[in-house]
């Protein structure tokens, strides 16, 4: 999906700050969220779906849906919890 090499300073940004930056138009901020959570999301989906190619497709769709829904993210829950729910719902479809 995206390159896993990121400058160390970027990894200190909080998820909420990265969400806010993404909503404001900073594409790099969303890339950092994807890099941070891509493997966790793929492992989660992999427990639900055994086809490796399908796991990657569902993970990609999860991040697309999350990106589109970011303006509605209120921060009531942790970002990963919100992303987890999107991944599970996407995998069930």
Residue spans of the language-model regions?
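Intrinsic, short, N-terminal disordered tails of RNA polymerase sigma-factor systems
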Residues: 1-24, 32-36
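Short, conserved catalytic or interaction motifs in soluble domains
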Residues: 50-51, 72-75, 88
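Acidic/polar helix N-cap motif
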Residues: 25-26, 51
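Sigma70-family region 2
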Residues: 23-24, 63-78
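Structural recognition of an alpha-helix C-terminal capping motif at a helix-to-coil junction
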Residues: 57-64, 77-89
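Amphipathic, Lys/Arg- and hydrophobic-enriched alpha-helical face
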Residues: 34-52, 69
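Hydrophobic-face residues of short alpha-helical interaction/recognition segments
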Residues: 41, 45, 70, 83, ...
């Amino acid at each position: 999906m995206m390159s896993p090499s990121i400058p160390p300073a970027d990894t200190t940004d909080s998820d909420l700050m990265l969400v806010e930056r993404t909503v404001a138009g900073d594409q790099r901020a969303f890339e950092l969220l994807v890099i941070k959570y891509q493997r966790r999301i793929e492992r989660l989906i992999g427990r639900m779906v055994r086809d490796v190619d399908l796991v990657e497709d569902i993970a990609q769709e999860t991040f697309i849906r999350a990106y589109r829904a970011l303006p509605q993210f209120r921060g009531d829950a942790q970002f990963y919890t919100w992303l987890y729910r999107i991944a599970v719902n996407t995998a069930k479809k």
